[in-house]
Every structure is written in C-alpha cells, then in structure tokens.
C-alpha cells in the first residue's frame, strides 16, 4: 500500500527560474542548508554535476564525495522527476513529480505529486502528520508573505526554520530574488551549472527550429525511468 502526497503553488517569476532550479542539484546545500534535507544527507556536500540529453529530455547526475550519484530526470518540456526525501526515517524515499506551467511571463504554477512508500501504521502516521502540517500552515502567514519579508530584509529565512513549508519559502526567496525575468547577461556559469547549460541549449535549439519552420525533436517518454536518492 502507498500514499499520495499532492500540492501546488504559484511562484512570482518566470517559469524558467523554477525549471532551472529543479535540475540544479548544486543549489540544495546552499538554498536548503538548514532544512529537513539535512536528516537524510541531501545537503551534506556539493555534488559533481554531469548531464546528458536523452530521448525524453535530460538525465542529471550529482555525484557525492563518496562516489554515489543522485539521478534526476527532466522530461521536456516541463516535468521534473526525482527521488524525494522522506519526512520520517520510517518512510522510504518518494517518487516525486512536478509539472511547471506558465501563467504569464512573470509567474507560473507548479503541480506536484509524490508516491509515498508507506503502509499500515506508517500510513496512518503519514496522514496524521499531513493533517497537522496543513493545520499549522493555515494559521501562519503565507509562504509568499514570508519570502517577500526575507527579500525586503525584514527577516532571515533562518528565523523561520521550524515552519513545515520552509523549503518552499527558501525556493521562493532564491528564485524570485533573481528577478521576475532575470538578466542572464550578467551570469558567470560554472561547472555546477552543467545541467542548466544543457537545458538552455536544448530550448534554444528547439525554439530556433520552430521559428525557422524546421522539424522539432520528437521527444518520447520511456517505458520506465529510475531516479535515485544518491545517499
């Protein structure tokens, strides 16, 4: 038996901000240095990033210092598939998917779903924890309000480390803080940006072909994909 965890949010920046953040494994030890990820090793070190184009999009590999690689998948044009970290040591790693959908040039919505590997008493505890988290969040200022306060310098994200939605707030700050439509001309990309560079090259190639009336790549979804935790 498994449980399903679903969620959605709006982020006030171009949807490419979130697309790129999602495939950037190196952002985790920085943006989420203080988060639930620490318990399960996702932010313990900075991985070496490699990526390759596939029939479905991009496969990303983040190899840790111990030689173990975390494998994520980006399915063109807007799907991310990863192993999501558990919220409890008694849960397995989740099969997590996110669809990023533009609303307009300066905002987008993410639709998220995860298969949670729990059964029996663990499933009951999962449902109760979800209920309590939703109840707690409903009584707090919204994630958008807290992110805006952090970006304005009125508080630090370290002041709100106990919030159940901390990771979402951290991502709001990191992505909206780049600007609704970032100035990419000012960037200095490095080795950890390998997956981002590849994704941009693919989008540039496909959009150029579309503009010139040339055939686009026929992306195909594989029968089976495997994401790994890397820890």
Regions found by a protein language model. Give the residues of each.
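C-terminal catalytic domain of Rieske-type non-heme iron oxygenases
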Residues: 1-231
């Amino acid at each position: 038996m498994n449980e399903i965890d679903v969620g959605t949010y709006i982020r006030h920046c171009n949807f490419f901000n979130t697309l790129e953040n999602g495939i950037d494994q190196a952002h985790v030890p920085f943006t989420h240095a203080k988060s639930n990820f620490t318990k399960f090793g996702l932010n313990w070190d900075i991985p070496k990033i490699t990526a390759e184009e596939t029939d479905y999009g991009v496969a990303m590999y983040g190899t840790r210092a111990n030689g173990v690689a975390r494998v994520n998948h980006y399915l063109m044009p807007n799907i991310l598939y990863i192993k999501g970290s558990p919220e409890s040591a008694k849960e397995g790693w989740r099969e997590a998917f996110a669809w990023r959908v533009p609303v307009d040039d300066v905002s987008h919505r993410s639709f998220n779903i995860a298969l949670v590997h729990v059964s029996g008493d663990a499933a009951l505890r999962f449902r109760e924890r979800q209920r309590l988290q939703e109840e707690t969040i409903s009584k707090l200022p919204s994630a958008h309000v807290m992110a805006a306060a952090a970006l304005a310098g009125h508080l630090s994200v370290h002041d709100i480390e106990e919030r159940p939605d901390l990771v979402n707030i951290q991502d709001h700050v990191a992505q909206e803080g780049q600007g609704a439509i970032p100035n990419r001309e000012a960037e200095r990309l490095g080795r950890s940006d390998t997956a981002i560079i590849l994704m941009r090259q693919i989008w540039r190639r496909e959009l150029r072909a579309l503009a010139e009336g040339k055939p686009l790549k026929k992306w195909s979804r594989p029968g089976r994909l495997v994401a790994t935790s890397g820890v």
